[in-house]
């Protein structure tokens, strides 16, 4: 709770800025629904803070381009840097570039590989991925009665979130009451709706039998749903789960197509990242790992989340 309050309650202090502060922001990509909400959350929050300006860049899912952006931020003398990493295994060089210039850096949403060895003026703001896939798979297990066959759609394998959410699935089905569930296919859809649809089309064409689809995010889950419906699948007899609770996912749940998702507070992470960056720029202490909780979303409580992401 202490960590959450640090990220979310600091706004009462930060609104009194008496000088201009420039924060460079490098997003992994602009053409991603969840990351768009995250980016908008940062920009909308910054507008409420006097003298705070964000310079937001699109890395276009290119690691080299993102490192270039970090180097340019350093050269331009920004007060702090926020990074949503393209590749979480490639963050050490970014940390080194910022540290060499003594510019604070905050990673947001995707856990950097060097998270446990970050310099004192660097931090990580996100949600704990040990919760996301666990909440999703536990609910799907419940809906399946603890037995059956599942397909797993993984995000980009270069992202720690994809690896962790997939491991969560394995951990849940490795224990009672879910040991009767087996994985028949597990492939990456790179977080993309189109790739989720293509994978599902291929699985259906191959005649693979399954009872549920477990996706690392909502976009791939929606793609799978589109392919299932195009093939004439009765969605009332199919279980599909995702993560993020995006507006499109909630619409799919209302339509009876998506059974489970997990709310990841994109705007909260964005605000927490800006708060952490400003505090570090002012020489204030920030915990190096700031977590915003995940929350399970089902048809039973969907009304509580319709206006959130």
Q: Where are the regions a protein language model picked out?
A:
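Bacterial N-terminal signal peptides
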Residues: 7-15
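A residue-level marker of the well-folded mature domains of exported/periplasmic proteins
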Residues: 3-5, 18-309
């Amino acid at each position: 709770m202490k960590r959450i309050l640090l990220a979310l309650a600091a706004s009462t202090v930060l609104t009194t800025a008496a000088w201009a502060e420039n924060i460079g922001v490098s997003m992994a990509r602009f053409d991603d629904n969840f990351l768009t909400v995250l980016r908008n959350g940062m920009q909308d929050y910054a507008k409420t803070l006097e003298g705070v300006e964000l310079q937001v860049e699109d890395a276009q899912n290119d690691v080299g381009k993102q490192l270039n952006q970090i180097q340019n931020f350093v050269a331009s003398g920004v007060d702090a840097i926020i990074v949503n990493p393209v590749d979480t295994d490639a963050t050490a060089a970014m940390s080194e570039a910022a540290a060499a210039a003594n510019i604070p850096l905050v990673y947001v949403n995707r856990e950097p590989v060097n998270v446990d060895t970050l310099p004192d003026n660097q931090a990580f703001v996100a949600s704990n991925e040990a919760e996301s896939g666990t909440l999703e798979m536990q609910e799907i297990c419940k809906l399946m009665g603890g037995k059956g066959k599942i397909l797993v759609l993984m995000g980009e394998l270069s992202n720690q979130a994809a690896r962790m959410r997939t491991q969560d699935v394995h951990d849940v089905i490795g224990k009672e009451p879910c040991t009767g569930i087996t994985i028949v296919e597990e492939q990456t859809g790179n977080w993309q709706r189109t790739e989720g649809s293509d994978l599902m089309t291929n699985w259906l064409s191959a005649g693979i039998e399954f009872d549920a689809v477990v996706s690392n995010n909502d976009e791939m889950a929606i793609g799978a749903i589109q392919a299932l419906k195009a093939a004439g699948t009765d969605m009332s007899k199919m279980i599909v789960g995702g993560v993020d609770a995006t507006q499109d996912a909630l619409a799919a749940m209302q339509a009876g197509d998506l059974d489970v998702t997990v709310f990841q507070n994109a705007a909260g992470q964005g605000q927490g990242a800006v708060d952490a960056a400003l505090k570090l720029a002012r020489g204030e202490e920030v915990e190096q790992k700031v977590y915003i909780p995940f929350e399970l979303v089902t048809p039973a409580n969907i009304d509580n989340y319709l206006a959130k992401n």
